[in-house]
Design a protein with these regions (language model features):
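Surface-facing alpha-helical segments and adjacent helix-coil boundary elements at the starts of domains
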Residues: 1-272
């Protein structure tokens, strides 16, 4: 493999992705390096290349590819959910479930690791606490796509178990890993992106104060952006809460980090 491929910046448009790069991506030999490449993955080709090596039967592979063809909207996220759902359905009662999960979560392809998040999150026999623990390596993944899919995969469970989730994630705000800390706010955003809303937090954002307070002056811009976006979400239904909190933070935490978060948090309110 050409070493330059591993250090590429990535094309801006899908049609500009080099043929060799796209081939290697679809074979599962390399990771995507940007959103353009991530969206360009042909999941039918990818699973056809990788799954036989994992011991997934030809019958199950055909079921998945058939399901992908029947999608009304063949987006990357829908494809990931689709592949994971069929895999889970076929393996949920199998003694090979855990073995396959480990293979998925440790694969070099970021798209394959994305499958692992839903493959585990869909398992109703695993407690939410154990889901958090088992998915922690993917929540902390070095790849942006895996991290995003991880919180989306757990979003419903978090919404259904909000009190527990907030208590658990409050502890994670102490993590040395910025990706873990960012997950605490990104996964609980009242509105979020590409996901269902958490109505209880839209109406009662104060429920998540234990998380927000811990991160109000976080050193990571990645975390700061998420905290600011969380509060901007909340400002659309509870501007009073966000305004009062930001006023207090400006007095209590006179740091550049907090000032940056406050500016992001108030952007909708200040637009009037």
């Amino acid at each position: 493999m050409n070493p330059e491929i591993l250090h590429r910046k990535g094309a801006i448009k899908i049609e500009n992705i080099p043929t060799e790069v796209l081939k290697l991506l679809n074979l599962g030999y390399i990771e995507t390096v940007n959103l353009t490449e991530w969206l360009a993955i042909d999941h039918s080709v990818l699973l056809g290349s990788v799954f036989p090596e994992m011991g997934v039967s030809e019958e199950i592979i055909l079921q998945i590819t058939s399901s992908l063809k029947q999608q009304k909207k063949a987006s990357a996220m829908n494809s990931i959910r689709n592949v994971s759902s069929v895999l889970y359905r076929e393996y949920m009662s199998s003694s090979d479930y855990e073995i396959l999960f480990q293979k998925l979560k440790s694969h070099v392809s970021d798209s394959i690791r994305c499958y692992a998040t839903y493959f585990l999150a869909l398992n109703e026999n695993i407690s939410l606490k154990d889901k958090f623990i088992q998915l922690e390596p993917l929540i902390a993944d070095t790849h942006f796509g895996v991290r995003e899919v991880a919180w989306m995969a757990l979003r419903k469970d978090i919404n259904d178990n909000l009190d527990f989730s907030i208590k658990f994630l409050t502890n994670w705000t102490e993590s040395e890993n910025e990706n873990i800390r960012r997950f605490c706010t990104e996964s609980t955003r009242p509105r979020g992106v590409w996901c269902s809303h958490i109505d209880e937090l839209k109406e009662k954002p104060e429920l998540a104060l234990s998380i927000l307070e811990k991160l109000k002056s976080d050193s990571s811009k990645y975390v700061q952006d998420s905290v600011g976006n969380w509060l901007n979400d909340a400002s659309k239904t509870r501007p009073d809460f966000v305004t009062q909190l930001c006023e207090r933070w400006e007095k209590e935490s006179q740091t550049k980090n907090t000032q940056y978060i406050v500016r992001k948090a108030l952007r909708t309110i200040l637009k009037g």
